[in-house]
Every structure is written in structure tokens, then in C-alpha cells.
Amino acid sequence: MRRHLQWSIKQLTSSYADGQLSPRRVTEQALEDSVNLKTLNAFVRLTPEEARQQAQQSEQRYQKKQPSSGLDGVTIAIKDNFCTENVHTTCASRMLQDFVPPYDATVCSRLRQAGAVLLGKTNMDQFAMGAGTVDSIYGPTKNIWSEDLTQNNWRIAGGSSGGSASAVAAGLCFAGIGSDTGGSTRNPASYCGVVGLKPTYGLVSRHGLIPLVNSMDVPGILARSVSDCVEVLNAVAGPDGKDSTTIRQPFTKLQLPEVDGLDLQTVRIGIPKEYHCNGLSAEVLETWTKVADLLECAGASVQQVSLPNTAASIFVYSILNQCEVASNMARYDGIEFGHRAADERSTEQLYAQSRAEGFNDVVKTRILTGNFLLLRKNYDHYFEKALRVRRLIAEDFLKVFEAPSKEDRVDILLTPTTLTEAPLYKDFSSLSNRDQCAVQDFCTQPANMAGIPAVSIPIRLSRSGLPLSLQLMSRSLNEQLLLSVARWIEAQVAFDSLDHRLEQKLS
């Protein structure tokens, strides 16, 4: 295995600074490994010429002792729903197959300014509508932890940011950018055994992220450690004049305390009883219990809490998701945006044929359902009711994070991320998209509904040798404590994200 893959981003950039390694060498090896592991289908498009140019510029900065930031020369992959200047951005859909943006998403431009090396675009579910990265026009993405990548018994990478998660887990890059609307960064992080961060809504700009659900979409970060996630977050977070939903105040870069410097006796951990739900595997439950005990033994206060509207959240999320999808997808008419059909007998026919050819069945179903729910006769009964329940869900979190009594108040919530280990592709694909998301998003989408930060961290391997992960959530803009506790857990469990016999899969 490439020795530097075991290093953190800080260790990597230190090796650049002292001349032990060079950005060009690391980039070349990343491009080579990405080709050798093409069977994963993590990347839909590599950009080798751009990456080599960025690596060369980074190397020159290090030679002058003038690196741009702590990310200078670090290889990063970008999900294919973030606009990248002069590089195709397709959302893994025929509708945008020929779209080449003339500008960068803010996340991408800030990474470039930080000196990062952008390797290419990663696979995803079409328009991010899925939880498995299985319905892309480029084919499904495989999980590097699969027992056998060549047979029909391989495991899904999760979704919809499965390409970025798979690339990070396989060591093809040091970090990946995903999006997270209902768990699309944390879900694949859980299945692929990496860290997946969903920041507070508004902390990271959505400018240039092709929208799915404007009120919930958040750029996400995938990396092999919590510290690496922090390095990327520090580069991309903060106000953006191009996105009116970003925070107004300047972002203060996070500096996590040393693991031994975190006083857990001042931290209160909540265990939401509603997350002990149907379908939760015995191994995930056991992992959840052991980590709660680990925190308690180290001095943290651990108590059960209630989030009473959790059971309704998946239904509310589904309604709001489909309504916003119907609105956002209306722009793709074959004239202003998107694939254009050859049939131009009439404007109506052109619209209909372009959308029929450009969208897959999953996208069409959500559009149709969303438009039905938004009909005048249904608007109050479905959409407005869902908005009211969404407010109640957000208030559930406020009540536990900001309870008047200190005894009832918690700082962090500890839950499962996914209910099971990564399922086999053949089992997952036998379910409808609706059923897939109902299972996969149960534990993750409430954080999006409330706009709070959440992070998934790998804990251990299942008896089948697959990663099992847990999720931490906290109040808005409390990433400092959230990630400090996550890093403490990470240090205790010492999970190796690269312990999947990569050499055998490269040979």
C-alpha cells in the first residue's frame, strides 16, 4: 500500500514541506490507482491534465516555502452535482450529459484557492435522488469493502454521494466533496468506513451546487479522519455573497483540542429512544451501546432523551423533498436547460419528449408526486401540514439542546447512522427507490429537517468484515464540540479506514 495513504492531511503537507514527498508524485499515484480501480466506478470523469497542472503549481509553492493553506497539494474528488468550470457536470443524468459550466461552485473555487488538487468528478444517484449510487447513467458504484468486486455479490457504496465515499475509502484521494439533503454524505460514509460531515445549514455555500431540495441541501465532506474533515471545512466554510442562505458572520476556523485535552465530564450525551427502531441490526445496536458505555466510563453524562416526532419525520421529509424536486426540476425543459429532444413539432411536444428522455423513472416519479401534492386541493393537506410538522421536528432538537434545566439538556446526540452494514447490490436493487430511502434515511434526514450539524464516524467491523458506523448530532454552529467528541471516539476505537486489503484489489 502507498505508505502516505495512512497519513493525515497534516502529515501529508508536512512531508511536502520537508521534501519527503511531492504533490506531483502523490497526484500521479492517485490518477494511476483510480485507473487501476476503475471497477469501483467511483469517478465518472478524471481531469488528469488539470490535476497535474495544479500539482505542479503546488510543488512550486512548497519549493518557495509559500504554500497556500493546509490543503495545498492535497488530492480531493468532487461530486458530479457541483459546478466545475469547463468540466462536465452531469448529476449522473442524461438531462445534463452535455452541460459544461462556465464557473466553479463556491466550494470548488475555495478549494482551488487553498491549493487543493481536484482529481475529477465522482459518481452519484441521478440528481442525488437515491441512497445507493445505483441508478447513475454511468452505472452503479461499488464498495471497496465488498468481498468480491468482480462477482454479483458486491456491496453498495451508499448514496447519493457514493462515488466520493468510495474514492476516499479506496485511498484514491484524501478527501471528497459530497452533498447531503437527507443523509447523502453520512450514509455512504457509514457503508464505506470513512468520516462523513454534514455541516450546519448555511455554514458552507450552496452556490454552484445543482439544487435538489433548497431548504435542506448542504455540501458535505468525506475523509478518512475527523481531523481531515476539519481541514477541508476550514477551507470551504464561511459567508458567500452568491448564496443568501449562508451565515452572515465571518467563520472562525476550527481548532480541535488534543484528544487528551477534551474534558468529557463537562459533556452531556443524549441517546434518543426513538432511534431504536424497526430494522436496526443487532450488531449496530451493540455498537451503539458500547460507544455510549465508553463515553460514560470516560466521565461524560449519558442519558436517554426523547425526540417524539421522529417517527413522522421520514414521511414529512418525503413530502417536502418531492414538492421541492417538482419545483427545481421544472427548469429542465430542453429549451433553457438540459437535454433537448429531436421532436420539435410543438413547444409542448418538445417539453414532454425532452423530459421523458432526460429523466429516469425515479426523478419522474418524484416530479409527478410533488406536483400532485402541490395541487390547490392538496396543498393545505400535504405541503402545509408537512411544514408544520417539520417545525415540530426542529423544536424537538431545540428542547433537548436548550432545555431550561441542566439535567434535561444535552450537548451531543449519539445515534446509528445506518440501520445495517452495507447491503448487497442485488438485495438493495430489488427494492423500489421509495423503500430504499425510507430505510436508509431514517436516522439521517432529521438533522437536515432541523438544519443542525451531524457527523458519521466508523466504529468497527461487523462479523461479515464490513464497517459499522455511528452518528453524532449537535445544535446549529456547534461543530467545534461535535467534532471534538467525534475525534475522541475515533481515537478510542482506532478504526482503520484502509483495512480492506487494497493491494489485492489493485492487482
Curated annotation (Swiss-Prot):
Ligase keyword on record: yes
Swiss-Prot/TrEMBL keywords: ATP-binding, Ligase, Mitochondrion, Nucleotide-binding, Protein biosynthesis
Subcellular location: Mitochondrion
Active site residues of this protein: 79, 160, 184
EC number: 6.3.5.7
Enzyme class name: ligase
An annotated GO cellular component: mitochondrion
One GO term of the biological process aspect: glutaminyl-tRNAGln biosynthesis via transamidation
A Pfam family: Amidase
Record flagged with keyword Mitochondrion: yes
InterPro entries given in the database record: Amidase, Amidase_dom, AS_sf, GatA
One GO MF term: glutaminyl-tRNA synthase (glutamine-hydrolyzing) activity
Reactions performed catalytically: L-glutamyl-tRNA(Gln) + L-glutamine + ATP + H2O = L-glutaminyl-tRNA(Gln) + L-glutamate + ADP + phosphate + H(+)
PANTHER family in the record: GLUTAMYL-TRNA(GLN) AMIDOTRANSFERASE SUBUNIT A, MITOCHONDRIAL, TRANSAMIDASE
Role of this protein: Allows the formation of correctly charged Gln-tRNA(Gln) through the transamidation of misacylated Glu-tRNA(Gln) in the mitochondria. The reaction takes place in the presence of glutamine and ATP through an activated gamma-phospho-Glu-tRNA(Gln).
Subunit structure: Subunit of the heterotrimeric GatCAB amidotransferase (AdT) complex, composed of A, B and C subunits.
Family: Belongs to the amidase family. GatA subfamily.
Record's protein name: Glutamyl-tRNA(Gln) amidotransferase subunit A, mitochondrial
Source organism (scientific name): Drosophila pseudoobscura pseudoobscura (Fruit fly)
